[in-house]
Amino acid sequence: MSEKKIVYIDMDGVLVDFGAAIKDWFEKHPHLEERWKDMPDHIQGLFRNPPPMEGVIEAVKKLHESGKYELFIATSAPWGNAGSAMDKRLWIEDHFGNLFHKRMFITHRKDLLLGDYLIDDRTKNGAGEFSGELLQFGVNWENGIESEYPNWDSILDRLL
């Protein structure tokens, strides 16, 4: 029996529709857009209730149920937003129950993680230097560029 492969999954722009969360926040607080437009990740509470990416809940469950992978969260949390780490953990719990219990890494150095795959929308925070294979996901919320793996169906096609 072979060992399971290790898969790290980023949150913002991969599990979580962070772009939609930012848009929604600015629609609700238009008078603050100028102040926060260059650093939306410092907005308290922004990470608590954003919507999941389309198809992500089902896709992650399929990866888990395949028995081929050990799944972990690998995300960064803004240093200037003390509540963001807890908000992210609670978001995971709300959407995945105990699937990621004690399987969450909050780091700005994803290159230090050992594993087979990293699903991330960006190459920042060490993702571009990850020791395994980077599966660059979706449409980058910062620059709008579509990656090789534009959605969760394409990730499942690659891994299952």
Give, region by region, the residue ranges found by the protein language model.
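Active-site neighborhood of HAD-like aspartate-dependent phosphohydrolases
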Residues: 1-47
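Short catalytic/ligand-binding loop motif for oxyanion handling, primarily in non-cytosolic enzymes
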Residues: 16-18, 24, 71-73, 80-84, ...
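A short, structured active-site edge motif that brings together acidic residues
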Residues: 72-79, 89, 93-112
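Substrate-recognition element of Asp-dependent hydrolases with the DxDx(T/V) motif
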Residues: 51, 56-86, 92
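Acidic, Mg2+-coordinating phosphoryl-transfer loop and its flanking beta/alpha structural elements
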Residues: 119-153
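Charged phosphate-binding loop/patch that engages nucleotide di/tri-phosphates or the phosphate backbone
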Residues: 2-6, 50-51, 58, 62-66, ...
